[in-house]
Amino acid sequence: MEIILIFFVSHWYLSLFFQTFFLHRYASHAAFTMGPITEKIFFVLTWIFQGSNYLSPYGYGVMHRMHHAFADTENDPHSPKYDESIFKMMWKTKTIYSKIASGQEIPEKRFTDGVPKWEFFDKFARSWPSRLFWGAAYVGVYYLFATEIWLWALLPMQFLFSPIHGAIINWFAHKYGYRNYEVKDTSRNFLPFDFLMMGESYHNNHHKYGSRP
């Protein structure tokens, strides 16, 4: 049992780290710089630690810039103000993200400038064979080490960690919590759950000062 719980918690925080550090702070906001080799290393590490949840740094970065530009308007890729359920919001998010990541939608230059892009690797990492490979690896870990039947209930969550991380912030941190700053959107600080989110729940602060680390 302990091995599965360690695996689950480690996967949660490692996948979240690469989402917040590489995809969010670096790809979206250029809060710091990387050389081309370091950047490619982070692409690969993101694929390893997000696994079946891999998010394209380009797709994520562009969409997140659009979120800040259009926060809580009809053009926001994900706003609880315009979607009546968390599931509808996340499906809309997935649709927009997929179109950007695959090149089906070409956003304005202001959203794409400087966002890291490695098309060959991204296409591979987002592919179904890649996702199925990681999914099979997770199933194998559970098969070998899940000593209690209830532990298998954790497995579906591991297939969906990245969307779960996004839903916590983009739904709950726009509906619940407190505000330090009056901004032109509904962002809030959702601190009771920030132990799960590595600082991402300071969402109102982030919407006020988006480029700060």
Residue spans of the language-model regions?
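Active-site-proximal inter-transmembrane loops
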Residues: Y54, T112-E119, Y176-Y209
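A cytosolic-side transmembrane-helix exit/cap motif
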Residues: Y26-A27, W171-R179
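Non-catalytic, topology-defining segments of multipass membrane proteins
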Residues: M1-I168, S211-P213
